Amino acid sequence: MEFDAKKATQATIQWIRDWFRKNGPDCNAIIGISGGKDSSITAALLVEALGKDRVIGVLMPNTSQSDIDMAQLLVDHLGIRHYTVNIGSCYDALMEEIRNSIGEVSRDSEINLPPRLRMSTLYAIGQSMNGRVANTCNLSEDWVGYSTRYGDAAGDFSPISSFTTAEIRAMGRELGVPEVLIEKVPSDGLSGKTDEDKLGFTYEVLDRYIRTGEIDDPKIKERIDTLHERNLFKLRYMDSFVYEG
C-alpha cells in the first residue's frame, strides 16, 4: 500500500493534540533540536498540533557543532522559542571524573554520554517550564536499536515512532520543512561516521525490509535480524523479577 503522507501527518497531529489533552492540557512541548530530519519534522508536527507558542526548542551543542546552523534554520523557520545549552563543559568534567575513577573509557561510552546529558537537560528545562519532553526516534532506528537508552530513546511521548525514514521525509515535505533539513545525512555527531556507515546498510534497504519483508542480500538480512532481536529490550519497560512467594 502506498504511503499517504497527508493522511499520516494529519493523524499524527491529532494524536499529539489528544495526548496533551490527557497528559498536560496546559503544558508546553520540549524538544531537542539537532538540525536533523527527525527533530525538525517532529518539531513541525508539534507546532501544527499545539501552536508555536507551546513548543520550546533546545539546541545542545557539545562545545562546538559543525551543523548548528541547521538547528538554527529550523527554529527560525518555525518561529518557536528556543534556547541554547552547551553541554561541552559538563561532558568534559564528567568524563574527566570517570577517567580519574576507572581509567580508560570506551569509545561507545564517549559517544553515548552526550545523548544522555542532552536528555537530562531537556527534562530539567521541562520541569522548569511546565513541559513534556518529545521523543524523536523513528521506526527504522527503533527497529535496529539505533538509539541511546536513556538518551535520545527517552521521552514522554513519541510522535514518529510508527514511521520509517522514507515516510518521515514524505511527512516533512507535507509540512513544508526546508528540504535541506529533510535530506540531511544523519550521523551521531561524534564518531565522524554516518548512521548508514555504522549500521552497515542503507535506510532504504532497511525501510523496504520493514514494510515488505523483502531484502536482496542475505547477509544484510541476518545483520538486521540480529540487531532487531538484540535491541528489543530498548523498547520494553525494564525487565523485573516478580516474586510470588
Which residues make up each language-model segment?
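Extended, folded domain segments that form the structural surfaces/walls around functional sites
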Residues: 39, 60-62
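Conserved G/P- and acidic residue-centered "switch" motifs that form tight phosphate/ATP-binding loops
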Residues: 36
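Short, well-ordered alpha-helices that flank and scaffold nucleotide-derived cofactor binding pockets
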Residues: 44-48
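Catalytic-core regions of hydrolytic enzymes
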Residues: 116
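ATP/NTP-dependent adenylation/nucleotidyl-transfer catalytic domains that generate, transfer
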Residues: 1-31, 53-56, 63, 72-90, ...
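Short, surface-exposed alpha-helical segments at coil->helix boundaries
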Residues: 40-43, 68-72
